[in-house]
A protein has these predicted regions:
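Phosphate-moiety recognition in structured ligand-binding domains
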Residues: 205-234
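Accessory alpha-helical/coil subdomains and C-terminal extensions
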Residues: 3-5, 11-26, 30, 46-195
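Anion-recognition interface
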Residues: 33
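Short beta-strand elements at the ligand-binding edges of bilobed clamshell
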Residues: 40-53, 209-212
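Short catalytic/ligand-gating loop segments at beta-alpha or beta-beta junctions
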Residues: 194-206
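Glycine/charged-rich beta-loop-alpha catalytic/anionic-binding loops adjacent to active sites
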Residues: 39-42, 72-73, 163, 203-208
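A short acidic, glycine/proline-enriched capping/turn motif at secondary-structure boundaries
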Residues: 8-9, 36-37
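Residue-level detector of flexible, active-site-proximal loop/helix-junction positions
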Residues: 36, 111-112, 201-203
Length: 234
């Protein structure tokens, strides 16, 4: 049994292995690493990340160009859960480095403070007349609570109550986080043009941004899993 994916896939493969043993089935389970989050232990990088990072970099490069003509504040929500690797890849889209977006980047490795966020957005907008922002879906407060959940409690919304089959809070399955941040900005800077997008599944499946190295490593990982399975070592 081969299961390709990240942490949840590894957990699922383990559950299947335990259940097979419990029922007396002869089954060997292999987890083949692949995750755009780039957060698996004992890895330098994960298959899937390179291609997704290219998509994010190109998306921000194009969005920054658009923002130069339709000036305002643009918030883009990027996947990654509790790892900021994919959001950090947004800066690879900067062309010259001078006033290129994203101008602000928010990762889950640091506590998200709404007050600081608004102050930084305002300062950037006043300096450049525009602002492009990269935000990880996993931003959270000092207690580790996802910001979307905090915002929902503050606003009386039910937007952050869903969890997946592994018990993980749904972070960017909808545009709720982007809308929440856009609303905060609109309240702090009334009259300002503010837009938000959630990249969603496109960033992990776009064929136009496949990394050659990523493609080769993914194939090698799958091949290694098959060799391990038929070798009888496991």
């Amino acid at each position: 049994f081969f299961y390709i994916g990240g942490n949840d896939a590894a957990e699922t493969a383990h559950i299947v292995s335990l259940e097979a043993a419990k029922q007396g089935w002869e089954m060997r389970c292999f987890h083949i690493p692949k995750t755009i989050d780039n957060d698996l232990k004992v890895t330098d990088h994960c298959p899937g990340y390179g291609s997704a990072a290219r998509f994010v970099a190109h998306a921000f490069q194009g969005d920054d160009r658009d923002n130069r003509s339709l000036r305002g504040i643009k918030v883009n929500i990027v996947m990654g859960r509790h790892a900021g690797w994919l959001t950090a890849a947004s800066v690879l889209g900067r062309r010259t480095g001078k006033d290129d977006g994203p101008h602000l980047v928010y990762l889950p490795e640091r506590v998200f403070e709404p007050t600081d966020f608004l102050a930084e957005v305002k300062a950037t907008y006043e300096r450049l007349g525009r602002c492009v922002i990269a935000v990880s879906e996993g931003i959270h407060d000092a207690d580790g609570k996802p910001f979307l959940q905090t915002y929902a409690e503050m606003s009386g919304s039910a937007m952050a109550g869903e969890v997946d089959s592994h018990g993980n809070v749904q972070l960017s399955g909808t545009g709720a986080l982007g809308d929440a941040l856009a609303n905060l900005i609109k309240e702090a800077l009334p009259g300002t043009r503010v837009r938000a997008d959630t990249f969603g599944y496109l960033q992990r499946s776009h064929p136009g941004d496949v990394s050659t190295v990523d493609q080769e490593e993914a194939r090698a990982a799958g091949r290694a899993a098959v060799v391990a399975a038929v070798s009888g070592q496991y």
